[in-house]
Amino acid sequence: MAPADGHAAGTGRGLPLLLTAPPADAPSPREVLQHRPLLFFGGKGGVGKTTLAAAVAVGSADAGRRTLLVSTDPAHSVGDVLRIGLGNEPSGVLPNLWALEIDPTEEADRYIAGVKERIAEVTPPRLAAEVERQIDVARVSPGAEEAALFDRFTRLMEEAGTGYERVVFDTAPLGHTLRLLALPEQLQQWIRGLIGRRRQVNVMRRMWRNVAGAAAGEARPDDPVLEALEERRARFARARDALTDPTRAAFVFVVTPERLPILETERATRILERYRIPVGAVVVNRVLPAAAEGPFAERRRDEEAGHLDDIRRRFAAHALLGVPQLPRDVQGLDDLRRLWEVLGRALPR
């Protein structure tokens, strides 16, 4: 990776890629981008988070780290940036890079099928049809796909340190992503309630069997429904612990020097702070290069300067990295490698 000289050779003379040095108590952006096992890229739609997530994943793979790049955005574009077709399961991209685009519909169908299988084991035959109908109704209810997506999301998080050294997430636009990241706290409470009620049901069953004797039938030595709930509670607890561990996870916000992305990103950083999810850096994308000339560029540069000052003020607690507006779209592995080199020049050693 190129030296951290604070300038982007060949992409705009004098561009201050390291917009501010990280505060003393902030994590090193170099360590975050190069080594953090769980890395989440997020931002307002259209700011370039997918491209930057892919560039970091390619750089990680080229450095010899087994890396999984995951898109949780329903409007997938990771495959477009990589110029390969992707599906709901990992596909090989490079010797150390795999990528997938989570399909919420497929995940919801798979999730519901698993629920039906577990419920069928403990449902009396006379109730089976009605129970299955109720499950099918739940499949099309609001939040079903989001819950299934989160279930897959937590499973993929556990791949970091097991199947892969790093998992890089290209997340959906901020509103959707913040709801997803808030789910561990919300679902923990919900599952605790379900487990409590399930245990009460099991107590009543045992009491009934003791009273009814052999006529009540043999008691099951296990309860697949309770086992599934306990497994999910444990997995969601691990997800919450991982998300809030600054040595394991970091969220990288991508913002452009424009008013609306700045405001939305500031609100998002406050929400993550509330949930104790560490912010590793803020990347300011598409900064106008100093080499750009002409009346339009001058007017744009004047307006951008005000936005950059605003960014420095609003995100003073975080490392701020700048990426210049490039002369053409980033497409394919070679372009992503060049972008990773540009970003690398901003990383303090």
Predicted regions mapped to residue ranges:
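C-terminal lobe/tail of nucleotide-utilizing enzymes
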Residues: 1-33, 85, 205, 236-349
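Nucleotide-state-sensitive switch-loop elements of NTP-binding domains
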Residues: 13-39, 47, 52-230
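Aromatic side chains
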Residues: 40-41, 111, 164, 251, ...
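Conserved phosphate-coordination/catalytic loops
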Residues: 144-147, 230-233, 259, 301-302
